[in-house]
């Protein structure tokens, strides 16, 4: 799976990087200054999965350049076993690097689906919530992507009936922060 390619980020030397590294997926929306994401002593931080507390979410990770390389080396030495053991790369990364629940402050990084969309019948009748107070980043994990959310559409990859059933009203304020 292409998601496992994220592990290549842990070879900072090959990428010409050193020091503290912040990885952000391309489908994130930055709402305000992200300086706080660099603060603290933890050598590795990632998001906590909003739907599976205690599990990591790899859309945003911060790590010290020399800290994560052993995880890439482990994967390269026994990828067959690791692929059979872990459903996703983020489960593998979280288990190996997220020491003592080293997650970002949950108020900084929020989920579009969980914190902006309505989770009940209101998704059919009401516009999504306004920008979450204090949030620095909105994560768009899966569908919709930011351009689709702005229009109120789940994207063409979903069948029309499913797009209707999932319901999504336009969220135009995201356009203030999103640039293609």
Predicted regions and their residues:
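A glycosyltransferase accessory/donor-loop signature
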Residues: 66-180
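Sterically constrained small-residue positions within well-ordered secondary structures
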Residues: 1, 51-54, 84, 129-131
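A short acidic, often aromatic-flanked loop/helix-cap motif at beta-alpha or helix-coil junctions
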Residues: 1-3, 53, 109-115
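GT-A fold catalytic core of metal-dependent nucleotide-sugar glycosyltransferases
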Residues: 2-56, 62-68
